[in-house]
Amino acid sequence: MLVSVVALLVVGTGMVLIPRDSGTPPPRSFSENARLAALEDTLLLRDSAVALADAPGPDAGKPGADDAVTLLTTHARALLDPAGQLPTFPAAGSPTATASSPKATPSAFVTELSRSGQQRLTDAHESDGGMARLLAAVGSAQLLSAEKLAAAWKLPAPTLPTTSRVPATAPAAGSCPSASPSPDADAATTDTALASLVRAQHEAVYVYQVAVKKLGASSVPAAARDLEVHEVLLRQAEDLTGVNCGDVPTGEAGYRLPAKFAKDPAAALADLEASSLPRFGDLVALSTGGTRDWAIDGLLAAGRRSSAWGAALPALPGLELDAGDLPALPTPSGTASPTASIR
């Protein structure tokens, strides 16, 4: 009835009713602010990496600077909005607004790259599922890149966050339903992601047990340490499955060793560690709270182990995508952008 009356008034008087615009844009979500802050920091860092790669004098041709440019370009492309547009910077309300580009010195660059990586992991804890996974991937890659560059440039190692924290204790008896339906193995849920990680840790423990007997003497201590890590990770993953009231998968009596294990056990271990990255990424996206915290820690630690065994760390560990599918960086216009050139 009210709609009809309004329509008659409009037709009879020729008036056009326009809703009042408050002039206040809707507030951005935490996840969107985190994305914008990550993009801003990444573009600033990319400018510094370009400057280092092109620097004359003692910093000329710094090894790894070109790789850092490539890494940060990929990160910036992944962090663009769906339309592939650069926003105006600084992003109001972003959790980590940066006033200016970091100084293009090796030491300052490593420090800022590490700081950015740590902030991305911090923001991943509270972001929505898909954005949490992207931020965890970007943060892990930036932290590990900072660590690698510090070693190559003979700088002090950046302070990195502690990984593989012990998860919450299992719930008390009676706090979980007495009977719950088994989740669909193909469904993307916290239960299925945890189950996948439990199975992967069972396999990793088995493979490392064999590896410590097959590796050369110089590699045995590292393999023995990683075996202990995977035994702890297995217990933690099982505990977290209990916390989430899921069914804990049992291990197999034995596992098929990777095809290259006989000829190159170290390369097989590198592949094994790298194969766990998407599993940790899944859990980051599909969980919350302490379970997500553990998954973020696990992603970073798995990336470090895979690199230590010789694997090439992907630009976005924990995400399975082709960088060629990402949007290209647009050429910025105006003076508000944190980066003056895209190459």
Where are these regions (language model features)?
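All-alpha RGS (Regulator of G-protein Signaling) helical domain and cognate RGS-like helical scaffolds
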Residues: 1-343
